[in-house]
């Protein structure tokens, strides 16, 4: 769990902002949301495969060359 030391004469909202930033960088929120509900291993593999397919389609679309007709 990330922690911060509140500096002397530091306002609470600035300390809270620093704490949130550290939590975001550590990935605490995403990890908690991911582990909120149980996910079957088959669902995990299915989701990962779908993400891989989406990535490849996105990369192929980015590299696709469109021919321009010259008439």
Swiss-Prot record:
Which GO MF terms are attached to this record?
A: structural constituent of ribosome
Keywords, in A-Z order = Ribonucleoprotein, Ribosomal protein
One matching Pfam family, short form? Ribosomal_S21
A GO biological-process term: translation
Tell me the InterPro entries matching this sequence: Ribosomal_bS21, Ribosomal_bS21_sf
Q: Which Gene3D superfamilies match?
A: Ribosomal protein S8
One GO cellular component term noted in the UniProt record for this chain: ribosome
State whether keyword Ribosomal protein applies.
Answer: yes
NCBIfam families according to UniProt? S21p (TIGR00030)
Report the family membership.
Answer: Belongs to the bacterial ribosomal protein bS21 family.
Matching entries from PANTHER family are given as: MITOCHONDRIAL 28S RIBOSOMAL PROTEIN S21, SMALL RIBOSOMAL SUBUNIT PROTEIN BS21
Q: What is this protein called?
A: Small ribosomal subunit protein bS21
Per UniProt, what is the name of the gene that codes for the protein in this document? Answer: rpsU
């Amino acid at each position: 769990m990330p922690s911060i030391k509140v500096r002397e004469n530091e306002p609470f909202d600035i300390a809270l902002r620093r704490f949130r930033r550290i939590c975001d960088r550590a990935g605490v929120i995403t990890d908690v949301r991911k582990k909120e509900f149980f996910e079957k291993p088959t669902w995990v593999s299915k989701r990962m495969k779908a993400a891989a397919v989406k990535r490849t389609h996105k990369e192929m679309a980015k590299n696709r060359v469109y021919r321009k007709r010259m008439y």
